[in-house]
């Protein structure tokens, strides 16, 4: 595989963020967070020629940060679109000036290559409960500016995670999106169906700032439709032991549920031609394994230690060189087997049963 086979690149251009969403890996791990960003020059080094960009999708998102906090964000979008790269990015929409957003809206209108997902989980009364530290009035101003710049021809979607506390504002948000000329979508995340979150916000009361704590829950029809499948995969991960039989005194592993599970994996890299570039400029098959690296889940750092410190760093290697590395080229797929020395159960949990764990987005 080489860059010509890659169709989609997810870019985490910064690990910085203006928000403090309680379910975010960044908020939960501030003690180990390193605020890192890459520049327009870094992006040009990674994608130096049109052939590496033309016709590909560049998703500005990531695990740890919001792309618009990166000072070079707009220049990156201009560079990629000038080389016929399609830019889709997710943001809480709470930063930048009105003029910045007007320019981005105009770029979307003029090129047809910019699509913004405004991740706004509520309306005036509730968005800040999960999107902690964001200000709805600023977000509304920025969405309005983007629509103004796009003159009705911009591409944008208001994506709304439906929790128990914000469900009642769905109609207000839906109507607001329609006025702006945006699509409207609801999103369900597996982690929200598996966990409750504690939100710490502040509000003014009698002229003083008062702390307010909210428990964020997702119940009933708002839960992910494949929750039971992921629970089944979790049970497999926890209990799997290879069944053995002996033939001529030679132990043989019996084909059991493992085959069903492994054959159902749909890998972002291997099956969909996608790569993920983290804010520290390391390259991964997906955001999930970068998240594992960030937290050192399943001792992933120790499992990769034999490759050296810069084996997947785009500061030291090209995309093609990293794709040719034995781990990307062969070991990744082999390691889905639970008995493999470099096995990461994250691959099963997030991508087995054909990506049961991953977000469900319903565009209306």
Give the role of each language-model region:
Residues 1-23, 55-62, 268, 272-281:
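N-terminal pre-triad scaffold of radical SAM enzymes
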Residues 1-5, 345, 349-364:
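Membrane-proximal basic amphipathic "stem/tether" segments
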Residues 2-6, 327-333:
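Short Cys/His-rich Zn2+-coordinating modules
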Residues 3-6, 113, 182, 267, ...:
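A broad structural signal for short, well-ordered beta-strand segments within beta-sheet-rich domains
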Residues 8, 16-19, 26-30, 40-122:
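Conserved SAM/AdoMet-binding glycine-rich loop
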Residues 12, 30-41, 52, 83-86, ...:
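Radical SAM enzyme [4Fe-4S]-AdoMet core and its adjacent flexible, acidic
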Residues 18-26, 342-355:
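Local cysteine-cluster metal-coordination motifs and their immediate loop/turn environment
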Residues 326, 331, 339-341, 347:
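C-terminal accessory segments of extracellular proteins
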